[in-house]
């Protein structure tokens, strides 16, 4: 007997949102948050630049440290050597929301060009200075390409 996997359940609004994200013609990575990393990959089949929920792989794959440092500092705006919370392998929304919201459209487009970013998926109450977007009750996709 199989049990129903509740983690695969989406309400109607979220199902529409993730279908739109999935159908978004993109070739780059997506910047995600603590809560949007997993569904970006799971429901939209889109690659994230880093899993903001956890990146505890560094001790096992030290050759990735330089790239992770660049992503965390340049895209997420967090000091790699002095993070808000030491020994915490995640990026919390409250650490980055004001950084993301304070960037101009031009700054986001520069990051998009430099790091091959197609979009940003954040909680729906964040206001990022990008016009083209897809909105749901829970998330917003800001399109960069």
Question: Which residues does each predicted region cover?
Answer:
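Structural motif corresponding to alpha-helix initiation and N-cap regions
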Residues: 15, 34, 102-106
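Short periplasmic/luminal acceptor-recognition loop of GT-C membrane glycosyltransferases, typified by
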Residues: 11-12, 19-91, 111, 117-126
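Transmembrane alpha-helical segments
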Residues: 1-8
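A short linear-motif detector with a strong N-terminal bias
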Residues: 8-11, 28, 98-101
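Aromatic/acidic, Gly/Pro-rich catalytic loop(s) in extracytoplasmic/lumenal soluble domains
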Residues: 93-94, 100-145
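Short glycine/proline- and acidic residue-enriched helix-loop micro-motifs
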Residues: 3, 90-94
């Amino acid at each position: 007997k199989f049990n129903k996997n509740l983690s695969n359940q989406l309400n109607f609004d979220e199902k529409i949102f993730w279908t739109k994200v999935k159908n978004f013609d993109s070739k780059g990575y997506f910047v995600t948050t603590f809560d949007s990393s997993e569904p970006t990959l799971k429901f939209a089949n889109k690659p994230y630049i880093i899993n903001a929920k956890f990146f505890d792989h560094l001790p096992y794959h030290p050759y990735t440290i330089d790239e992770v440092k660049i992503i965390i500092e340049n895209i997420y705006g967090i000091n790699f050597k002095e993070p808000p919370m030491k020994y915490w392998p995640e990026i919390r929304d409250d650490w980055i929301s004001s950084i993301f919201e304070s960037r101009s459209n031009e700054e986001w487009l520069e990051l998009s060009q430099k790091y091959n970013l197609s979009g940003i998926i954040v909680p729906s109450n964040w206001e990022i200075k990008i016009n083209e977007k897809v909105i749901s009750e829970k998330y917003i996709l800001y399109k960069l390409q």
